């Protein structure tokens, strides 16, 4: 059977809407700019879709060359500009500690209002730090489809947050 690459995705802010790409450079730290930013709560703990499922509705973009970050909220509000680095902070993700800088400005109030609780946007000190298990996540369409049942039909593959989506593999063959 023929194996094809059917999707490439990234999200400059961890847990926000995935951005589709036609082509990308892949390095040992994953896709450039992917999950470079993340959210923390008022206690400094990482916030993901597990804490606020609605985060996937916020679109974002980051132009590294211009140091320009943009978020587009579902109501159409756009916040765009240079993310001003505030104080340094350490965050723990799946047992790994890494450093970043809190981003100052309107970003925090807008995202907090959307989530319904206080959050702060953080820029990771180094690219490629904010992955869950691996810098790249590879998923086959048939693996996702095999999880469908009478209760869960037409599962949106984006909920699995793949970096690379492949078609033409047997379910879970990408694990090997």
Label every PLM stretch briefly.
Residues 2-176:
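Small-residue-enriched flexible connectors and coil-helix boundary/helix-cap motifs
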